[in-house]
Amino acid sequence: MSDTTKPPMARKMGLTAERVHGERRVEDPSRSVMTPPKEELRANVKDLSFWYGEFQALHAVNLPIARNKVTALIGASGCGKSTLLRCFNRMHDLYPGNRYGGEIDLQPEGQNIIAPGIDPILIRLRIGMVFQKPNPFPKTIYENVASGLRIRGIRSRAVLDERVEVSLRQAALWDEVKDRLHQSAYGLSGGQQQRLCIARTLAPNPEIILFDEPTSALDPIATAKIEDLFTDLRDDYTIVIVTHNMQQAARISDYLAFMHLGKMIEFGPTDECFVKPKHAMTEEYITGRFG
């Protein structure tokens, strides 16, 4: 098979026909293939199920999240990856009738964050989230970043100033906005607004950051700037990202989780999943032959 006849993703990832098709794969869609991380875990999803009312969206999902690594969730639309992501910070609690089963344990303490009696507000301070479209508050740039700190009870102007600057620097935005901190956030470009939302998420110093397709509404230049952040952010944070972009998943993630119809199909190191997937459905998806 020549390069021009390989599936587009196989060409993009440099996969050869022998490496993609040369070994027997697991074909049973009811079976998942897991290659656990060698690193210490920051969170551990155990037999997680989730229902929107009577509809079951997740089926006994297991997913280990390695500390200070980027884990990418991939799969076709409707596979449950965004549903899974929003379980981590209890976003589903905002709508009546939704319910969980199983566990999401934060490590090392082993606290099940979806257990009854756990305050979701406290969970969201520990697990931040950046959404698909930039959603700055109708406030100044400064107040967008400081808002989460004020919720935590921080009132010292010196502390607020320091955390705002540090967070904007972490989001690679400080040099672009340092002279207009007290102007409206709506005056920023789309890419700048998304980096502002990242800074806002970083300010309270969360343990885990969730990204739900954070670059899907941005142009390639803005996308590249945000992707560049992941290398630095993983030094201090554990990251879980949902993406439809296979190239992006390959560029930025350490671990890959492929989902289908609310089930975990395969999880393992990103390079292994792309170069040598162990499940036939994973191979079909990443080589563009899925469905």
Swiss-Prot record:
Q: How does it sit in the membrane?
A: Peripheral membrane protein
Q: Name one Pfam family in it.
A: ABC_tran
Identify a single GO molecular function assigned to this protein.
ATP binding
Residue sites binding ATP per the record: G75, A76, S77, G78, C79, G80, K81, S82
Keywords (alphabetical) are: ATP-binding, Cell inner membrane, Cell membrane, Membrane, Nucleotide-binding, Phosphate transport, Translocase, Transport
Q: Which InterPro entries match?
A: AAA+_ATPase, ABC_transporter-like_ATP-bd, ABC_transporter-like_CS, P-loop_NTPase, PstB-like
Q: Could you tell me which residue ranges the ABC transporter domain spans?
A: 43-286
The family database entries (CDD domains) matched by this protein are listed as: ABC_PstB_phosphate_transporter
Where does it live in the cell? Answer: Cell inner membrane
Entry annotated with the keyword Isomerase: no
Tell me which domain of life the UniProt entry assigns to the organism this sequence originates from: Bacteria
Q: Return the GO cellular component terms, semicolon-separated.
A: plasma membrane
Quaternary assembly: The complex is composed of two ATP-binding proteins (PstB), two transmembrane proteins (PstC and PstA) and a solute-binding protein (PstS).
Family the UniProt entry places it in: Belongs to the ABC transporter superfamily. Phosphate importer (TC 3.A.1.7) family.
Q: What is this protein called?
A: Phosphate import ATP-binding protein PstB
